[in-house]
């Protein structure tokens, strides 16, 4: 044979070949058929077991024998792929209604691998036989196998709605399917209702089908995801394990009796052990597996004093004790096309398939009954003229002549004459003749019944209903998975997060984190500090606030926008950790810089105002209620003039308060908050201070009119001073202020000012990430017109970047 070479573009060949491969994987491997709910390999395994006679009441055969049968006759692929599919159909934790009975080690819920196929044995479950029932009655199309030597079913008759009953999952090329299993009794009720009322809505069908029913039980949180899945074919459901809190002699413990579908028990136990070490609020003393043949049981022993509800909710959050099931009901329809179907479409496809099966079965049975009745009719005629029949046969030269003579004499067909010639003499007894007559009469009634069925589609649908109800009676069981109506998977943060004191820091490049306050150790004045945050030369801490985990951090940016972040959402980590970018929490713009970090509790905003000060000396006062509905994209807090930017912000709780504003060149002004009228959220503000030359505002602090506290001022080179607030008399807003510190040429410009008491502690953080915690009492009070003293010993390449007062939790 001459060689033929076809010249073709490699691009075209790759496209064509890959498309063929893709469709082969989609249609022939990974996606189930909507009619019988089986992937090709599963269908071939069940058909192969039927061919081997492995019914539920027959003896087991080695799995290797089954795999060999399927691989050699129907599925010429890897033996392990076939064995894995066989194993899964036998696992009660994988299939809601297993189709295969396994004998031996077929794996476990701990994801232990099954024994080799040469050791295990299998046979069909009785329910699997229902999927194959009537396959010998021309109910489904039979197609050639891979080499054309045998035939196999294109789809099984599937008396049971296997697609939704057992679900399916698979990944093809460019598409995937993930269909959850359901309760058979609920499916039968819904299918029956749809047969009775083809116009039933999905919402009406959901009165019968409550939701997925996983083999491992669990709780589905809410019905929204279920409804969306049934309406669109896609949906996400939160599934929780079932856990109970028990009081024992040794203390409190949590006992898990059910886990989410698809979760490995061993992996879950390992996850619990890991989070117990890494999440400080999960106070777990010990985890052990007490599962046995009676069921699953994981016992979590809690530390003394631990709140079990707190621990349980944190386990839901941090482990696979709570998972999300993403449903994607993609199937292969009757035309061999992948299609995303909703609940009603799947039901309609199944009913249509069953209609065809029942119709073809009835037609087959009618044909067989008609053929048999035809024969019996001839035998009956012969029985009425036995002597004549015997004479004809005896006087005929051969069988052919006898057949012709019988046809002519009795007026029968060739088939009937052939049956008469093949009839045994024993059939000529009176008893046997009576049986023939009776059988013929019964067949006539059956033929009438079959024709009646085929005469009206309603009769076929009634048969479908009857067979479904018989299935429910035999295989239906109680629902295993509970459904929580409210669907609230959120838990009260106050129940699970202790309101511990933390320090929130923000770096110049926008990294934010929360650190437990206890991680900052006390040092004396002049100490070199400890590393507070890992930074680089190009990044350093710019803002720090002492707050609590249940407060909100308010980030005010240079562009006048306010961002609100729940502190419990912040990464709570060590001093040396860099934290996470603000962009992980809020949608801060690239050209914005953080100018102030505040703390507030949502329930305490009623009488509070946000005071914003700009670099060019503007100030505004806005009620905090205006910011309640803040968005992750931020909310505008002030309208800025060209060239101006926000430099600081604070929280005011009373009009009796005053505000002290410090400038870069050591000037300070103090005036009453009442001189700033409340404005709208987007107002531009009023003049706060008259600035000289290129001087700029660096900070603003809010205080009471009569206040025995002190103003702590720090400079770039670590020089600070603590001056009684009484030294700064109130002035009118928009004045030039008074001198606060001298010797700036030696100490560097002012970084900021804070109001402190003798009991307060101050955290000073430098550009290079060093931090020092200083008791305010260690800094000797001085007058207003002084140079200050050294409070932080800095390295040559370092400067002070920011400072904050460590406050008691009650003050936050």
From Swiss-Prot:
It catalyses: ATP-dependent breakage, passage and rejoining of double-stranded DNA. Its EC number is 5.6.2.2. It comes from the Bacteria. SUPFAM superfamilies: GyrA/ParC C-terminal domain-like (SSF101904), Type II DNA topoisomerase (SSF56719). GO terms for cellular component: chromosome; cytoplasm; DNA topoisomerase type II (double strand cut, ATP-hydrolyzing) complex. A motif (GyrA-box) lies at residues 523-529. Keywords: ATP-binding, Cytoplasm, DNA-binding, Isomerase, Nucleotide-binding, Topoisomerase. InterPro entries: GyrA (IPR005743), GyrA/parC_rep (IPR006691), Gyrase/topoIV_suA_C (IPR035516), Topo_IIA-like_dom_sf (IPR013760), Topo_IIA_A/C_ab (IPR013758), Topo_IIA_A_a_sf (IPR013757), Topo_IIA_dom_A (IPR002205), Type_II_DNA_Topoisomerases (IPR050220). It is found in: Cytoplasm. The active site is at 119 (o-(5'-phospho-dna)-tyrosine intermediate). GO terms for molecular function: ATP binding; DNA binding; DNA negative supercoiling activity. Few gyrases are as efficient as E.coli at forming negative supercoils. Not all organisms have 2 type II topoisomerases; in organisms with a single type II topoisomerase this enzyme also has to decatenate newly replicated chromosomes. Heterotetramer, composed of two GyrA and two GyrB chains. In the heterotetramer, GyrA contains the active site tyrosine that forms a transient covalent intermediate with DNA, while GyrB binds cofactors and catalyzes ATP hydrolysis. A type II topoisomerase that negatively supercoils closed circular double-stranded (ds) DNA in an ATP-dependent manner to modulate DNA topology and maintain chromosomes in an underwound state. Negative supercoiling favors strand separation, and DNA replication, transcription, recombination and repair, all of which involve strand separation. Also able to catalyze the interconversion of other topological isomers of dsDNA rings, including catenanes and knotted rings. Type II topoisomerases break and join 2 DNA strands simultaneously in an ATP-dependent manner. PANTHER family: DNA GYRASE SUBUNIT A, CHLOROPLASTIC_MITOCHONDRIAL, DNA GYRASE/TOPOISOMERASE SUBUNIT A. This is DNA gyrase subunit A. It comes from Kosmotoga olearia (strain ATCC BAA-1733 / DSM 21960 / TBF 19.5.1).
